[in-house]
């Protein structure tokens, strides 16, 4: 299975620890080390860590770098500083989401885009396509980086004792460069994909194993993609390729905060997003809780109580924290009403569900 798949610097660690390895976005990645529920609960209640070195990194440098980054991205990049990162979207001309990503301003005219692993090549091709109009140099630097995510309510106290900076006041998307961790130079970002406090750590690829092992020695639970998915779904955080796609806009996909179409600067997809901001989008993303027994999977139709199709499930799972069957779905905007009962078509059965908040973390 793994011969043709890409591997992170930690691949041998997965094998040695007996992790269950699966294909994900062209990579051989651990879906679980022990059990998804154990790993999920470690992050929800204590602290766990993920290898996210498969994520892509795209560097944009040059005299027009700040202009180019704004032209590519839907958020207002004027808010970026060399200590404040930003969640944003790479949109096409129709406002559809090519990828959702995080932007770091490393320095003047020096930016780093952190993109989803499965989309790295596609994103880089898109960036290259639009670069010639600007005085910029773009590079896919993914192989230079390792990335770990240390997440959970106890993550801050743990990391605080291991780095040479004060992390106590760091807020979401605050970051610091040139931080020393286990003797290695890292970028430390207060961010994650779990609904919990925590940090994402960017290091040189060659340092990834030493940093991972350092956390293992501090009894941090290694976690796989299975728990990463249940944690993000409980928190109502979208996954590109399911909840966000090239035919779903930020307003439809529930990430309107990452679109700023009223700014002066132009960006790709701006006119469509401006229209949706002013007039509303035809669809919206909602949280669902299934009232009947079953799991709502990606692509299952969502119906009104008369059996008319009004949307589809984009992600679904059984929430380890609450035991409830939860989902995210995209439905016609005028069908939305919090608490409304709907049906989900699960094979030949129609299961009752109700619209709830997307963030369904219950402790």
From Swiss-Prot:
**EC code(s) of this entry:** 2.1.2.10
Purpose of the protein: The glycine cleavage system catalyzes the degradation of glycine.
Give an example GO biological process.
glycine decarboxylation via glycine cleavage system
Against Pfam families, the record matches this protein to: GCV_T, GCV_T_C
Name the top EC class.
transferase
**Under what name is this protein listed?**
Aminomethyltransferase
What GO CC terms are in its UniProt record? cytosol; glycine cleavage complex
Source superkingdom? Bacteria
Q: Which HAMAP family match?
A: GcvT
Description of how the protein assembles with itself and partners: The glycine cleavage system is composed of four proteins: P, T, L and H.
Q: Chloroplast as a keyword? A: no
One of the record's GO molecular function terms: transaminase activity
| Entries under InterPro entries matching the protein | GCS_T, GCS_T_bac, GCST_C, GCV_T_N, GcvT/YgfZ/DmdA, GcvT/YgfZ_C, TrmE/GcvT_dom1
- Catalytic activities: N(6)-[(R)-S(8)-aminomethyldihydrolipoyl]-L-lysyl-[protein] + (6S)-5,6,7,8-tetrahydrofolate = N(6)-[(R)-dihydrolipoyl]-L-lysyl-[protein] + (6R)-5,10-methylene-5,6,7,8-tetrahydrofolate + NH4(+)
This chain's source organism reads Staphylococcus haemolyticus (strain JCSC1435)
